[in-house]
């Protein structure tokens, strides 16, 4: 019997059980814990496409028709990185959903073929060998300021956006709110043809319950409370009362100036109810200087945004001007300047790094064009993980590879926001039954630029060379829209998430939309313990005079990074 060395096997079929892979140019390594597509015990008839290879008629390709259950697409021999594990598998897609992770091929000629991965004449093949597959990213903090953010997001591995806005209006530039049923209807129509799942947030800054119910019937998926509209205790309580009755989530950007109360007053108004705390961080806004302490509470689902990810020597310098623009402030007004400066605290920005590494801050979003960069959600997440690896070493349970840390960080922009907003039945992980919103990465470019973005089973975005070239690879190779980004295909492979009451009220009949409307579900019972790998509740204290942060009694010292991976080695600008 012919034997292959591990190195030769990896060259032919991709790495297998026990092999380790470096993520981009970071210090992070992953180790494959299981190979369902081949490797030890299954080597010899891996599903590989190409001239002289396995997936040919009467060899790896069988006779099964689509009507008999053949998958529409199989991604072969790919390393799946998800919150639940790091394995290698062939991944099957049918009707836009994941149907199996196992071994693909022809059971007439091959052993161990998964019954839902029988390759037939109707099956397309995407070669995942030597590549990494993650769930499509979920940006849980989006300002819909301009439509071009869709291109940037897709090019960064994002397939779902949660947020609000109506365009470059001052309210939208500041507050991630789509206010009122008219604006909501127009935005749902405008976003119908993009290869992106959408969950709009309505305005929760009101004590008028009817105005909130009106927005729910109009198609929002939940509410946003923002200090620029007045995040008072009364508004918080009123919004959460409606949210509890409607079964939707509330995202909160609290009161930086402490005008209507302090962080303790906001927590009292929340009264133990589930809430997504935006900007649980060092510079994004919310009660100064101690909004970060809410990450210790069991009912609070905390997120932070990417402009402070990770803490570097340049973080503070860029924030003041960004803040003045985003929140319609004037440097000529002393009070505006003081407001801005109160939000930018190096000690709490530094603590944000550690709280992410502990799993105490559960999610990362962009805050797109409102201090954050929508194309860098995934990239900034992995830069943070790298910085923490360098400073803190391996996490408990890791030894020689960083599987625990990697599974924690990938959850921050996939399953955790899906759970927080009631979307996890449809998206958020690489699991059977979910939409095939998937991102394929070359390991050398992991987190930097995807090899391909698959939306609802169809390639929507990909690294592609000159279209007039004789082959697909000649330079310039750029992230480009593919056929899955065409409006009708995009609508067929994407969804709008809405409140259940919108469907009960006949929204689908009132609006001429091409895509499915899907109700959010199982939201109000969620808590920190439901955040996979990100459920820590350490004791957090902030000194009101020095802003020193103590986590479980220990001071976390500022050590801003002077150099990062995934940066100038990959980008000219």
UniProtKB/Swiss-Prot annotation:
Location of the protein in the cell: Cytoplasm
Query: Mind telling me which Gene3D superfamilies this protein's record contains?
Result: Metal-dependent hydrolases, Urease, subunit C, domain 1
Which positions does the record annotate as the modified residue N6-carboxylysine? 224
> What post-translational modification does the entry describe?
Carboxylation allows a single lysine to coordinate two nickel ions.
Q: Where is the active site?
A: 327 (proton donor)
Enzyme kind, highest EC tier: hydrolase
Which residues does the annotation say bind Ni(2+) 2?
224, 253, 279
Pathway where it operates: Nitrogen metabolism; urea degradation; CO(2) and NH(3) from urea (urease route): step 1/1
Keywords from the UniProt entry: Cytoplasm, Hydrolase, Metal-binding, Nickel
Q: Which reaction does it catalyse?
A: urea + 2 H2O + H(+) = hydrogencarbonate + 2 NH4(+)
Q: Where does substrate bind?
A: 226
Question: Per the annotation, how and in what number is the cofactor bound?
Answer: Binds 2 nickel ions per subunit.
In short, the EC number is 3.5.1.5
Instruction: Look up the record and report any one GO term of the cellular component aspect.
Output: cytoplasm
BP terms from Gene Ontology: urea catabolic process
The question of whether Hydrolase is a record keyword is answered with yes
Q: Which residues form the Urease domain?
A: 136-573
Residues binding Ni(2+) 1 are: 141, 143, 224, 367
Assembly: Heterotrimer of UreA (gamma), UreB (beta) and UreC (alpha) subunits. Three heterotrimers associate to form the active enzyme.
Family as reported in the entry's similarity comment = Belongs to the metallo-dependent hydrolases superfamily. Urease alpha subunit family.
Name assigned to this protein = Urease subunit alpha
What species is given as this protein's source? Rhodococcus jostii (strain RHA1)
Q: What is the lineage of its organism?
A: Bacteria, Bacillati, Actinomycetota, Actinomycetes, Mycobacteriales
Please name the gene that encodes this protein. ureC
